[in-house]
Amino acid sequence: MIIGSHVSMSGRKMFLGSVETSIENGANALMIYTGAPQNTRRKAIEDLRIPEGRALLTEHDFKDVVVHAPYIVNLGNTFKPESFKFAVEFLKEEVKRADALGASQLVLHPGSHVGAGPDAAIASITEGLNQIITPEQNVKIALETMAGKGTEVATNFEQIQQIITGVEHNEKLSVCFDTCHTNDAGYDVKNHFDDVMDEFDQIIGLQKIGVIHLNDSKNEMGSHKDRHENLGFGTIGFKALHYIANFDKFQNVPKILETPWVKDPDAKKHSPYQLELAMLKSGRFDDTLIEKIINN
């Protein structure tokens, strides 16, 4: 199983620190943002401590590195040309950072139509990706399945395929399948995951799935809410998520946890990833996990 979580890349250690944290968590893959996900301020590539981090990855036989683009870039905004242009230029540089980090996937929230309608946003996203993607890049841009919150697009497989079809170098595109998002978008990943995969395969092709975001959901299927929950404590449940993590066609696909940190009574937050990864590997749900995370 190729499994890991989102880890921070910050401070003096930058990427080296991300790798160290992932090793402590018992992971063999990791996902990072190249800076804060809520903004686009980024350090120079030479300041990210990539060589030391890559050396440690090799030493510990890590299988994959995934980068996530910040939430705030929106290729789907047709009302503000300056926002579209900024998103294109930022993502061109983000591809360079992801390649320097040796990432296989650059996860991207495709965008929101902000009132213009899905078709207009999809056309804009396609145009933007055609400006960003080059045949020379190594990293694939992984279009994330979205929950349908607000005016998000890519909330169904057909919309994602529309984008892929419109991109010239779509061999450089993949899909990030988020279990919480697809549940909230209305796909029954809990009870009928095989059927969901058959539908995905018919519309897009399973070979396009480059990374799985393995998250439980706080909300019911079809809620369009996008609120992640710790594994086994949401509406999808541990049994289904463990099945997805071990799905035979995903053996070489990284599974990344983005589950929420747990607050103790003093409102201090605790990382869940070490214990969640251990639980996932064991295959046994622990209903005392939240308490253990707080006391870990």
From Swiss-Prot:
The cofactors named for this UniProt entry are:
Zn(2+)
Write down the EC number.
Answer: 3.1.21.2
Q: Which SUPFAM superfamilies match?
A: Xylose isomerase-like
Record GO biological process: base-excision repair
Which residues take part in binding Zn(2+) 3?
H181, D226, H228
Listed Gene3D superfamilies: Divalent-metal-dependent TIM barrel enzymes
How, per the record, is the cofactor bound?
A: Binds 3 Zn(2+) ions.
Q: Which GO terms describe its molecular function?
A: deoxyribonuclease IV (phage-T4-induced) activity; DNA binding; DNA-(apurinic or apyrimidinic site) endonuclease activity; phosphoric diester hydrolase activity; zinc ion binding
Family affiliation: Belongs to the AP endonuclease 2 family.
Q: What is this protein called?
A: Probable endonuclease 4
